[in-house]
Amino acid sequence: MEVENKRVIITGSANGIGSSLSQVFREKNVESMVLVDLDQSNNLKLANQVGGIPYKADVGNEDDIINLVEFAKQEMGGIDIFCSNAGISGAGGLLSTSNEDWNAIWNVNVMSHIHAAKHALPMMLDQGSGYFMNTASAAGLLTQLGAAGYSVTKSAAVSFAEWLKITYGERGIGVSCLCPQGVRTPMVEDAPEIVGSLVSIDGLLEPDDVANEVIECIERDQFLITPHPEVVDYMKIKVSDPDRWIAGMQSLTKQLIEAFPDAKPMLRDLSTEEELD
């Protein structure tokens, strides 16, 4: 889909990839943008810079998405491209992640995409065209050591995007799924050292570079967006020989524990001092 003169929604717009997307869309002369984030301090500044319309919403709350879609319809006359970009980190293992945390991670990293599609799709179908760009992660294709909630929800996000593309791709609805490794965003920069080391194994990309690749992929209707080319190679290994892949990840875990002894509880999913011995 050509992005020029299109009406765009971007969630998670205040920082990182979302902020960069808004700037690249503006350079591409979109007609209008609604910029969605809970952080309205940064979002208002960004909206002034790029000429977007700021909007505050909790993307994991379905009522907020319903209201967002209605707002976009009133302000822009419709939605051509919905960048469902918001996400949260969800570090922690099975034993250290509470049910409350699981629900929060699930709502933002999975249900936000589902709510967006559920409520924007009918409008797009009536228009005869539309596009969803869902931000997942390489963790959704591979896994994220020490982060059960993040791995599970990002895998679900990839799966939903794939289903959406298969089901609606021949009805004028484009879908892309963004799966980067490390990107220089506040989420990565504020993470513990071990997390930063994990996601930057193949290098940290700048958000602007990722955003430019996203726009290019939207314009050629490419489903899977992997800004780190190594991810595709890892996927081939994983699919061709899952046992080899798992053994490799187990070996990487041991190496990381040697390099970061304090990270052992997270990487081994340990919950008590006795288990640390």
Show where each model-derived region lies:
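Conserved glycine-rich cofactor-binding loop
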Residues: 14-15
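The beta1-alpha1 cofactor-binding region of Rossmann-like NAD(H)/NADP(H)-dependent oxidoreductases
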Residues: 41, 57-67, 99
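Substrate-binding pocket helix/loop in short-chain dehydrogenase/reductase
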Residues: 93-94, 101-106
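Active-site helix of classical SDR
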Residues: 117, 153
